[in-house]
Structure formats: structure tokens, C-alpha cells
Amino acid sequence: MKRAIIILLAAALLLSVVGCKKEAKKTTLTVAMSPDFAPMEFVDTSKTGQDQFVGFDITLANYIAQELGLTLEIKPMSFDACQTAVQLGSVDMSISGFSWTAEREENFLLSDYYIAGDNETEQSVITVKAKEGTVTEPAGFAGWKVGAQAASLQEKLVQEALIPAGAELVVYKSIDDAVLALQTGKIDALAVAHGNGEAIISNNPDIAFTGYDFEVDPKYENNVCLLNKNSTELLQKVNAALAKALAAGVYDGWYNDAKALAGISTASEVSYNDDGTAPSN
């Protein structure tokens, strides 16, 4: 009899614990970002904690979190790790300058488009200052080593447009590593979003645009948020927030503010490790 009572009490306790878990209200929106992509997402080294992460996408993420009644928590990590984290469900979503691609549509739920500015729809190639303006056609990259960030739209564009013309693709985990490779002669050029190229050039006077811009299919021109395939309810809420932001006409102001912030002395593109730890100096 005592054993039966103990079992019943244990079962009741278990049910109450399960019930409490079900009733627990979500308070945080976790968003994976790779803060090495100014002016979209980067770091203000004069600040610490969550406040150090700045840029257009951070402003957008804060807006979405506020619309959902949640507190934003940025989870910094490498660009390809952001995508893995969404697939594994270890974060709610990722906002990190993602363009639409067929592969992303297959592997994720994609939000409606958001527009960060004309400079983020153009895709360009940068090189050392001595070669500024010397290449305007794909054929001009024959024999060149052209870098791109892993799992990025730029990697795809190099594969489609420059490799057939005789270029060699070199993939880097981070933009920082790719820029260093360009400066040290390990690669001849680097494919970038035009706005990111402007930010890189403003901080590195030894780098310039080649003069070549990719011909980009319009479907690649706007940005999307990545969500797990099972997050249909969250996707609806995110899309509602994006629609409200678009109707309010706030995107241009956010982008201009981010560009200005990317030019301050404490602005830095920081490449985090896959596990979210800060790089060692």
C-alpha cells in the first residue's frame, strides 16, 4: 500500500513538473550572427556584452524581438556555423546578411525579403590598390585566385561566373581571414557585397575595387532571415514584423546609421569561432 502511494505521489509530482515546463513563457529571441560583415553586423569595441554588436541586422533583430515582446540575445559565431545552428535548433533564427539561394530555400524556412540598401544588392570584387579598376569582365580574372567566404552568395557567384573564365576559387571561413590573405598575396582578389567592400576599403587603404560587378539575378538581391523548418509559427510573426518595418519606411535610415557607425575608429569586423567563442589575439 505504501509503495502504491509513493508511486502515485511520484507520478503526480512528475506531471506537475511537466505542466510547469509547458506553462513556461518564452522571454528571449536567440539570433545567430557572424559580426564580421560591416555595415550589416559588426562590433563596436568600445562596448561590451550584447551592446557591442551593432549594424543594420542588429537593429532589425531588435525590432523583430520588440514586435514579438521578447528580449534579443545575439549568438555570435562563424557564418557557416550560423546556418548549422538554425538547422540544429540551437537558436531561434539567424539574421546575417543572407541572400536568397535555392539551397537555403531547400534547407530552411526563409522569411519575406527585407531591403538593406542598394549597396547590399550589388556584388563586387576587391583587390590590392595597385590593381584598382583593372578588371571589368570575367575573362580578366583568368589565372587569378579569387577568395570568398564559405557558404556565402559570393562563393556561389565566383563558381558560376569566374571559374568558367579561368579563375581559381579559394574559400575562407571568415571575411577577416580573406582580407588578410589578399593583403599578403595569398589571393589576388576577394568577392564581396559592395557595401561590405566599401567598409573594408575605408579601413584598408591598400585595397580597392577591381572595377567588376557580378551580374546578379534579381532573386538574389534582397536579404532573408533563416529559420528552422519546424518554426512555421515564428516565421509568421517574423514576416509580420518585416511587413510593418517596410510599411514604416525605416530601412534606409537604419542602413545609413549602420554605414556611419562602420566608419568610427572603434568599429571592427570580428570573426567568431564556430562554437561562439571570441577569437584569441
Give, region by region, the residue ranges found by the protein language model.
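A ligand-binding cleft/hinge motif common to bilobed small-molecule-binding domains
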Residues: 81, 87, 97-107, 157-161, ...
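Short, solvent-exposed loop/beta-turn-alpha elements that line the ligand-binding surface or hinge
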Residues: 41-59, 115-119, 139, 268-280
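Acidic, polar ligand-binding/catalytic clefts
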Residues: 71-140, 216
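Periplasmic-binding protein-like
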Residues: 35, 116-129, 201-242, 261-281
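Extended ligand-binding regions for polar small-molecule ligands
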Residues: 58-67, 130-132, 144-145, 150-153, ...
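Extracytoplasmic small-molecule ligand-binding "clamshell" domains
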Residues: 25-98
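Bilobed "Venus flytrap"/periplasmic-binding protein-like clamshell domains
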Residues: 31, 35-38, 50-66, 122-175, ...
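Short, low-complexity disordered leader/linker segments with a strong preference
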Residues: 1-28, 279-281
